[in-house]
A protein has these predicted regions:
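Residues within membrane-spanning alpha-helices of integral membrane proteins
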Residues: 48, 102-105, 109, 167, ...
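Residues that define the loop-to-transmembrane-helix transition and helix capping
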Residues: 41-44, 69, 95-98, 125, ...
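Hydrophobic alpha-helical transmembrane segments of multi-pass integral membrane proteins
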Residues: 123-143
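Alpha-helical transmembrane segments
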Residues: 6, 46, 97-103, 220, ...
Length: 239
C-alpha cells in the first residue's frame, strides 16, 4: 500500500508539472495509471479534483486572456452532456472503463503527435457539437482537453490565448463533472479524502511548471508532454 501511495504521488506530481508548463495534459497523463491502480471512478474523481484545484494557480492569469466567444459555445453543451459520461463511468464494467480511459489517451496523444488538427476556423455549430462530445468524454474518462486542443489549434489565437482557453474550459467542465459525480453518489468520503491527499503535490508541481512556461522551448515542452501521455496510456492498456 505504501508503494502504491508513492506511485500515485509520483504520477500526480509529474502530471501537475507538465500541466503547469503546457496548460493541458494533467488528466490525460495521470488518468490511465491511476485507473489501473485505484479503479476508474477514483481515477476520474482524483483527476477532476486536481484539474479544478489547478485553477487556484492558473485561472487568474488565464481569465483576462481567453476567447470568450469560442469558449461559450464549447462550454455550455459540454456541461449539459457531462452527466452522460458520468453514467457510463459508474455503470460500465470497471475493467472496460480502464481500457477505454487508456485508449482515449493513446488515440489523442497520437493525433496530437501527428500534427492533426481541425482545418477550419472554429464556428458556433462545430463548437456546440464538439462541446457535447467532450462533455461525455470528460464525465466518463476525465480526459476532455485533447479534442479541444485539436480544434483550437485551427484558430488564429496565439499560444498564450489557446493555453488560457484550455485552462478556463477544463476548469469549468471539471467543476461541473465533480458536481455531477457527487450528485449520483460516486464521491464518497474515502474517495474524496484520497483525492484530497493528492492536491498539495499537484498544486506545487503545477506552480513550478507554470514558472517555466515561456522559458522552455514550446515544441520541446509539447512533445515531452505528449510522449508522457502516450507512455501512460500504453501502460494503462497493458496492465
Amino acid at each position: 500500500m505504501e508503494m502504491q501511495h508513492l506511485l500515485v504521488v509520483g504520477v500526480v506530481t509529474l502530471a501537475g508539472f507538465m500541466r503547469g508548463i503546457t496548460g493541458f495534459g494533467g488528466a490525460a497523463l495521470m488518468a490511465p495509471v491511476l485507473s489501473a491502480m485505484l479503479g476508474p471512478v477514483q481515477a476520474v474523481v482524483t483527476a477532476l479534483t486536481l484539474e479544478t484545484a489547478a485553477a487556484l494557480i492558473m485561472f487568474p492569469d488565464a481569465w483576462p486572456r481567453f476567447n470568450r466567444r469560442v469558449l461559450l459555445y464549447l462550454t455550455i453543451p459540454a456541461c449539459v452532456t457531462v452527466p452522460i459520461g458520468g453514467y457510463l463511468l459508474v455503470n460500465v464494467d470497471a475493467f472496460i472503463m480502464r481500457k477505454v480511459i487508456a485508449g482515449v489517451v493513446v488515440v489523442f496523444a497520437l493525433a496530437l503527435f501527428s500534427g492533426l488538427r481541425y482545418s477550419r476556423a472554429p464556428r458556433p455549430a462545430t463548437s456546440l457539437a464538439l462541446g457535447g462530445i467532450v462533455g461525455v468524454l470528460l464525465g466518463a474518462t476525465s480526459v476532455g482537453a485533447p479534442p479541444v486542443i485539436l480544434y483550437l489549434l485551427a484558430s488564429s489565437d496565439s499560444h498564450t490565448v489557446i493555453r488560457a482557453n484550455l485552462t478556463v474550459f477544463v476548469t469549468a467542465i471539471s467543476v461541473i463533472g465533480l458536481i455531477m459525480l457527487s450528485a449520483i453518489g460516486a464521491i464518497t468520503v474515502p474517495v474524496a479524502a484520497d483525492a484530497g491527499v493528492a492536491v498539495i503535490p499537484f498544486l506545487i508541481a503545477t506552480w513550478l511548471g507554470g514558472k517555466l512556461f515561456g522559458k522552455m522551448n514550446e515544441l520541446v515542452a509539447r512533445r515531452t508532454a505528449l510522449s508522457l501521455m502516450l507512455f501512460m496510456g500504453v501502460i494503462g492498456l497493458l496492465v
